[in-house]
Amino acid sequence: MNAWDISFSSLSVGYGDHAVLHDINATLPGGKVSVILGGSGCGKSTLLRHIIGLSRPISGNLRIGGQDLFSLPHAEARRIRRRMGVLFQDGALLGALTLVQNVCLPLSEHLRLPKDVLREAGLRVLRMVGLEDFADYFPNQLSGGMRKRAGLARALIAEPRILLCDEPTSGLDPITAARMDALLQAMHRQYPEMTIVVVSHDLASLCCIADHVLVLREGRAIFSGTLPELEASRDPYLLQFLRREGGDEESLADAPADPRVSAALDKWFRT
């Protein structure tokens, strides 16, 4: 078992006594790219929020590397979740802060680092997603696609072992969406040990990097397996997700991590 496997066992999640997810049994393998698919309202984002810790299970459990997060002492569960980076669907940048200040928030809120070290850490991840030249812009000066890429940079700044992306191409035009997909592909190449989970309604542009696919329908898991297994399915509902579209290849700019930031993060992860 990989230390960063994400497993659901008879998991039901909801609000109050109303279940949105019903009896989910699946494992998203560590160090791989998993895509959670399904139509609107099927529970994809609810499942992602549950991994982050924004909801408690009605029944069943969630395990990371075999550890049931909701049975662990709070401090231990928090240490595991600190290794998660999240790209939320809305991006949620603070309008009063510049782009680099927004990206640095996961560090500046928890680590005592000199301002120049923080800024360089922010510039490093902005460089990775092609936004270094816009570091001192404010969010209202950026396009929707640029804000999404900034959200990705912010998710990467704390050197996560698990990256969770909620509809990363939602609301983007086809060209910008293809570039975001290409960035995810580039990230998988550069960080092959990172567990990446992408919530989407379309597998098309992620086929080349999807190691595992989980399909939800009306709050239930109807498929969990590899892409070849999905391709071998005769279920029309499953096969609709295999429409392929071409996309340009993207690469991440070379941006080695600052050892001062890595050392501070390592200390924080252990507290």
Identify what each model region corresponds to.
Residues 163-166:
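Catalytic Walker B motif of ABC-type/P-loop ATPase nucleotide-binding domains
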Residues 52:
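Helix-to-loop junction immediately C-terminal to a conserved catalytic motif
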Residues 159:
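Conserved catalytic motifs of ABC-family nucleotide-binding domains
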Residues 174-176:
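Helix N-cap at the start of a conserved alpha-helix in ABC-type nucleotide-binding domains
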Residues 178-192:
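Helical segment within the ABC ATPase nucleotide-binding domain
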Residues 138-142, 146:
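Conserved ABC ATPase signature
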Residues 67-68, 115-133:
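Conserved ABC ATPase "signature" region
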